Amino acid sequence: MKNVLGVGLGFLLFSLSLIACSSEEKETAEFTPGIIPGVLAKTGSVDSLVLEGKIVTFLYELSSEDCFNEYRLIDDRTGDISDLTTIVDCRRPHDAEIYGEYVHPSAAGEPYPGRTEMNRWASIKCFEGFKDFVGSDYVLSDLEIGSIPPQREDWEVGLYRTTACYVYAPGSQLSGSMRGSGI
């Protein structure tokens, strides 16, 4: 009797370990980084859009490895348009992911370098950081680079001199973090 019980218990433990392994594989497979073709509806009235994630009240709240969605809200009564950004879990479909933050080298108190210079500098820094984050050369990647540079008003009051760089796939959403994805 003891032997039959031991064999039965052994079989049960073996079966449970197989189930646990297959559920781990399934969970890992669900979060494989990728690009989801097509864009979810991100424009609509305040009442019709379903927002996901934490609402960002100030774009400078976004930081490295934050994944985010962008929405365009239209007020049905006035026709006013406003843009809204939310931080979401990177395992959920998202529009973009912040991969780097770079402080402009100008000394405190120096005037704003201008939009053209700021965009040029941001493009260089974002390009330089792309391969280290994604794991592939930009020219071979399906991802594009975007940046959120400081605005003149924020620069002049000394609040922000940091540019945030992000990756996105035009016309699509991302799934999982793009860190080391090679996409």
Where does each model-flagged region fall?
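Bacterial N-terminal signal peptides that target proteins for export
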Residues: 1-9
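C-terminal motif of bacterial Sec signal peptides marking the signal peptidase cleavage site
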Residues: 17-20
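Primary mode marks residue(s) on the alpha4-beta5-alpha5 output face of response regulator receiver
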Residues: 22-183
